[in-house]
Amino acid sequence: MKSNWKITAFLYMCSFLGSFISATYQQQSRLPVILGARQRTDLCPTIRIGEDDLPGFDLISQFQIEKAASQGIVQRVVGSTALQVAYKLGPNVDFRIPTSAIYSNGLPDEYSFLTTFRMTGATLQKYWTIWQIQDSSGKEQVGVNLNGPMKSVEFSYKGVDGSLQTASFLHLPFLFDSQWHKLMISVETTSVTLFIDCIKVETLNIKPKGKISVDGFSVLGRLKNNPQISVPFEVQWMPIHCDPLRPQREGCGELPARISQTVIERGLPGPPGPPGPPGPPGVPGIDGIDGERGPNGPPGPPGPDGDAGKAGSPGLPGEPGADGLTGPDGSPGATGPKGQKGEPGPPGARGLPGKGLLGPPGPAGAAGLPGEVGRAGPPGDPGKRGPPGPPGPPGPRGTIGLQDGDPLCPNACPPGRPGHAGLMGMKGQKGSKGESGELGKQGYKGEEGGQGPIGEVGAQGPLGIPGIRGITGITGPKGNKGARGLDGGPGPQGLPGAPGGQGQRGPVGEEGPKGERGPQGTRGINGLPGPKGESGLPGVDGREGIPGMPGAKGEPGKPGTPGDTGPPGLPGLPGSPGMKGIPGPKGNRGPPGVPGLMGNSGKPGEQGPEGEAGPTGPRGPPGSRGEPGPAGPPGLPGKWGPQGDIGLPGLPGPPGLPGGKGDRGSAGEPGPKGEQGAPGSEGDAGEKGDLGDMGLPGAKGSVGNPGDPGSRGPEGSRGLPGMEGPRGAPGPRGLQGEQGAPGLPGSQGPAGKEPTDQHIKQVCMRVMQEQLSQLAASLRRPEFGAPGLPGRPGPPGAPGPPGENGFPGQLGPRGLPGLKGPPGEIGRKGPKGEAGERGERGFPGRGVKGLPGPRGLPGEPGKPSYGREGRDGVRGPPGVAGQPGIPGPPGPPGPPGYCEPSSCRMQAGQRAAGKNMKGP
């Protein structure tokens, strides 16, 4: 049952790879069809800019490189990733085909050349052309050239006058580094643009291009000055696309991930500078990528102690050291004369914690100097196996074969197809230990690792040197009057503080309740010299009273108006240097330095076997300051340092915890009414707030090492969900948030625990030690006084000269429509306009009655209708005699006739004579 999930995962991966291979095959099989149709049409058919599935010329298919690889003429190699296939073109293969077979009608006026390739070995230093079109005499008409000695890329083209023109892209050393790169050139009518690894490098203007001749040949990988010699290189992808804007949409996801890079637009060449002096020693290299943790090795023998190094720069403040022993009480000094008006006294004992709203995060402190380089740690666990080395140089040329070969390999028979994979061999014996290899070159800076686990709490470290005083924070909002805190016990006498920076004027605070009179305190030492203040108003003469102890902390009043600064005090004694601090934590990343000149890439050496750890060498001189490295793993707890000497009294620290309640002192004499006290000290930090907003991106970094480009592979199907990655590094510090609204007054909390005398002594000693170096630093430079209070605003100055015209501002928002202006003057008659569009039908007009028109043509016959019967017409004239009609039918027999006797006989004789009688 345990292996069921493995079988399921295996079947899922097989189906994923099958669909990916099928999609890749279908995508590759489409291109020759497009190319075949492409050659039978015009240069580039009617296209829409922005489409990727447009006709083009696939040079790998046109030069039949895949066929040559199947015959063993060229070698198939792994491309920019494990899923990509590339071809290694050797120096003995002649890739030359007639131009008319690819570009039967020549090249279009606008197109783009794209290729993913890699140069290795001696090719990096050669001046060669990766693609070229020659005329019938072998002269170059169009080509893309790579100039190894000059570290530049050239685009050559035939001009209108027939001369060869060249556009050169200079200062590209990152292209010549034995890595996979994606080179794309966008050729337009009047300009040509170079892209390397999907980053725009430069756009150059070009002259009009002439029409090329298709009577010559197209070649790949030739020397520029001797086109008969082939140059070895590896190619993964090489099309010519009909869309000149294709490089702007191309991605570089198939290139291996490397250090992020930033390509800066090349500026105008500056004048040659004078030769500089020899530079200082180089900074230490960047740490390599951490290997995975291996098995724990046996403990090694302890190494000898190195020589003591020179004193390093002061480190950042370390963790608070162990509490020192309490010193003996000093003898009381003699009563001194009445001093002048001093600075406001230290704040009273800490009140009960309030529950205010979380304030905005304060600004980050300045980064301190790095500590001294520590001793070398024990040998680390062995890392992962390094990447495979670069391909070796080509072997010697083989002997001439005995048979005639293929036209593409005339002197050798192609090897047979690769056989099936053999069975897995037996496990070999453990080899003998190899010799120690040479030290490899400095590796690239590794990517920032994920957040490591929280280390165990280390032992108390020695006391570090106090850090630099932070910048003055912004004035907080005026808080509401809080509830009166419980009276704390009298705290220990604090030392006078150095003059603080001038704070912003706060609102006038409410008058706090008068504090109870405290017991008499001992006289403090003289403070540091303050800046000379303005003469104050004369105060009321009071009685000379005995200085009393600080009273219990009264209710905090609202900030009052800053008082005048007192006269300077006597300078203090110089303090002894404090103990050397441990190296501080990693500081914030500094601003990017000025980009240095790019050096020539060296030839990569073969990776040697991992050598044994050598003996510990003598300690070298301290190197120059290196770049901040990544945060290392938590170190082992250090040993306790020796007890340090008691330093001079330091500057006053933050208020201590409330002291234990002392015995009630005897009633003192009533003192004069005290002046308004200074604002109380800032309370302890509140609870950890929510995560702040993401900050703005940092300043633009310097030019990084270029990444390896590669061609864009086919889009794969969706992969299996990956494992959850390591937690990323914390983001950049966010901007300081807006000032929050004042919180409501908190309710009075429970009484805190009364601290012990030992705890109070520890706090005082810690504060004195933290402020010790700041006091010593101020005493070492007495010629610079503390900054004085800002003066009153001066009178307005005279108006300055008019400034230069600024850059045009951003387009403002659309303004409101203005008021209707007065009618303008009648303009001059303009030129006759163009005929307008046909207007809509107008309303019927009223015209003057016109003259009768000419008689119209007879109309068409009307539709039949029923009319009324008309009147009888007038008798007409007799008509024309008609034609004889058809004889009618025989009439009925007539009546019997009669005749007169005289006429009857004559008619009978006539009838008898007229008849043709036959017979009797």
Swiss-Prot record:
UniProt-annotated stretches for the region Disordered: 264-462, 476-757, 782-920
GO MF term list: extracellular matrix structural constituent conferring tensile strength
Complexes and interactors: Heterotrimer of an alpha 1(IX), an alpha 2(IX) and an alpha 3(IX) chain.
Protein name, as recorded: Collagen alpha-1(IX) chain
Organism: Gallus gallus
GO CC, alphabetical: collagen type IX trimer; collagen-containing extracellular matrix; extracellular space
UniProt subcellular location: Secreted, Extracellular space, Extracellular matrix
Domain notes: Each subunit is composed of three triple-helical domains interspersed with non-collagenous domains. The globular domain at the N-terminus of type IX collagen molecules represents the NC4 domain which may participate in electrostatic interactions with polyanionic glycosaminoglycans in cartilage.
Residues in Laminin G-like domain copies: 50-244
Disulphide bridges: C44-C242, C198-C252
